[in-house]
Curated annotation (Swiss-Prot):
Family according to the record: Belongs to the LAMTOR4 family.
Modified-residue entries (Phosphoserine), positions: S67
Function: As part of the Ragulator complex it is involved in amino acid sensing and activation of mTORC1, a signaling complex promoting cell growth in response to growth factors, energy levels, and amino acids. Activated by amino acids through a mechanism involving the lysosomal V-ATPase, the Ragulator plays a dual role for the small GTPases Rag (RagA/RRAGA, RagB/RRAGB, RagC/RRAGC and/or RagD/RRAGD): it (1) acts as a guanine nucleotide exchange factor (GEF), activating the small GTPases Rag and (2) mediates recruitment of Rag GTPases to the lysosome membrane.
Protein name in the entry: Ragulator complex protein LAMTOR4
Keyword Cytoplasm: no
Domain of life: Eukaryota
Keywords: Acetylation, Lysosome, Phosphoprotein
Free-text description of this protein's post-translational modifications in UniProt: Phosphorylation at Ser-67 by PKA inhibits Ragulator complex assembly.
GO biological process per UniProt: cellular response to amino acid stimulus; positive regulation of TOR signaling; positive regulation of TORC1 signaling; protein localization to lysosome; regulation of cell size
Primary gene name: LAMTOR4
Cellular component aspect of the GO annotation: lysosomal membrane; lysosome; Ragulator complex
C-alpha cells in the first residue's frame, strides 16, 4: 500500500529501496532498506554532519540533495522539513571518467 508519504518514492526509476526518517526514526521503508535501522542511524548522522557545513547564514539546510555513490548503487538523500528521504538506486553501467 502506498501512502502520501511514499507515493513519489515508489515511482523512481531503478529504485532498490527507500527510507523516510524523522529525527532518526524510520517512518516508512521498503526494498533493500526495509527496516534498516543501522542505515537509518548512519544516514541521520551523515545529514547532521553535512548540516554543520553552513556556507551562508540563514539557510535551513545547506544542501538540496546528498549523494553517496557506491560501486553498484547510490544513496540519494533529500531533506524536506523535518523528514529525510533516502532512496537506494541501481547505478547504470557507464564507463568511468578518467581525471
Amino acid at each position: 500500500m502506498t501512502s502520501a508519504l511514499t507515493q513519489g518514492l515508489e515511482r523512481i526509476p531503478d529504485q532498490l529501496g527507500y527510507l523516510v526518517l524523522s529525527e532518526g526514526a524510520v517512518l516508512a521503508s521498503s526494498g533493500d532498506l526495509e527496516n534498516d535501522e543501522q542505515a537509518a542511524s548512519a544516514i541521520s548522522e551523515l545529514v547532521s554532519t553535512a548540516c554543520g557545513f553552513r556556507l551562508h547564514q540563514g539557510m535551513s539546510v545547506p544542501f538540496k540533495r546528498l549523494s553517496v555513490v557506491f560501486g553498484e548503487h547510490t544513496l540519494l538523500v533529500t531533506v524536506s522539513g523535518q523528514r529525510v528521504f533516502v532512496v537506494k538506486r541501481q547505478n547504470r553501467g557507464r564507463e568511468p571518467i578518467d581525471v
